[in-house]
A protein has these predicted regions:
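Non-catalytic C-terminal accessory region of glycerolipid acyltransferases
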Residues: 1-124
Length: 124
């Protein structure tokens, strides 16, 4: 009944999305719980702005939860499922961000599907 926040990329700060490590998906599958995709943008400049005495605009978007995830089978099947679910997680996060922030997931067709599910629309 508690909440655990994990940065699936491994805690790095980047202006665009990078590949996820399998830890977030692995923990969620072992806990038999759902994953709630969340995007945070604008934070990459927060410290520099704060040190200069300026404020930052940080945007947090929350998508629809998915799971629980079942990861069973041989070692190879489990690794494939971890990789697949990790990619799904990152595409769901990408759906919450403007297109220029998709990074490693640019052009993935599932982003549009997840964006529609979440009801998000970004303007240029």
């Amino acid at each position: 009944g508690k909440i655990l926040g994990i940065f699936p990329e491994g805690g790095i700060t980047s202006t665009i999305l990078t590949e996820a490590k399998p830890g977030a998906v692995f923990i969620a599958s072992k806990a038999n719980t759902k994953i709630l995709p969340v995007s945070i943008s604008g934070g990459e400049y927060a410290w520099d702005n704060m040190l200069k005495g300026n404020s930052s605009i940080i945007t947090i978007n929350i998508g629809k939860s998915f799971g629980p995830l079942e990861i069973k089978g041989s070692k190879e099947e489990k690794m494939n499922k971890l990789e697949s679910y990790s990619r799904e997680l990152m595409c769901r996060i990408a759906a919450l961000l403007p297109d220029n922030k998709h990074g490693d997931f640019t052009g993935d067709k599932t982003i549009k599907k997840y964006r529609k599910e979440d009801g998000f629309r970004f303007f240029k």
